[in-house]
Amino acid sequence: MKYQNCIFDLYGTLADIHTEENSPQLWAHMADEYRRQGAPWQPEELQAAYLRLVGELEGGASSAGDTHEAHPEIQIEQVFQALYREKGVDAGMELAVQTGLEFRRQSTQYIRLYDGAAELLRALRASGRGVWLLSNAQAIFTRWELDQLGLTPLFDGIYLSSDYGCKKPDPRFFQTLLRERAIPAETAVMVGNDGACDIRGAQTVGLSTVYIRSNISPKEPLPQADHVLETMDLNRVKAILMEA
């Protein structure tokens, strides 16, 4: 069994998602939410403040495509909390998280599993392989979405970038999973839809790689992965992983 541990990206690999964070309706709704809690934001003012605070927390971090620099990750709930405090409301973290979840629900146009996603994970676990999630994601959004999609119990471990302060392609994020789970790199494979973050990032720490070009993959040349799928086909991914 070559691939004893299978590491997956989430969005664009197992789950298809579309969010719209620029719609006037979203920011009008969120301004109403803040006003109900005593924070009198106007929609355009709120959006501008949100973007400013995100930028401040990111601290000018390099873009996801630059694999030569570290890639810090923020905790988005801090932004929602700061938006209350800028209007004089001493909001606790529980309210900030609930506000963040409302933002995510309102900005998500759809989220759904790709065909065969759950079946793939179940088959790998039934075969005795380790199944792990390593995703650039905000924990307050993604843990709720994993529960809604029924994926949480299908992983042996879930690693979300906002919990660790760094994100793919930063080698530290991959190494955290390998170290904490005592996984030798030569026994593991990374499956993802992003050539820079998933594939080249994984290769820097010695992982095998499977690339899937999905509907939300970055527009980039096909990467030099061990296996390259030019279209979404999780049944083919299952065959690759189970046969190795």
Indicate where each model-derived feature is located.
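A short, well-structured juxtamembrane/interface segment
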Residues: L113-A117
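Asp-based, Mg2+/Mn2+-dependent phosphohydrolase catalytic module
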Residues: M1-C6, D16-E20, R35-E44, E94, ...
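A metal-dependent, Asp-based hydrolase signature
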Residues: A31, E44-L101
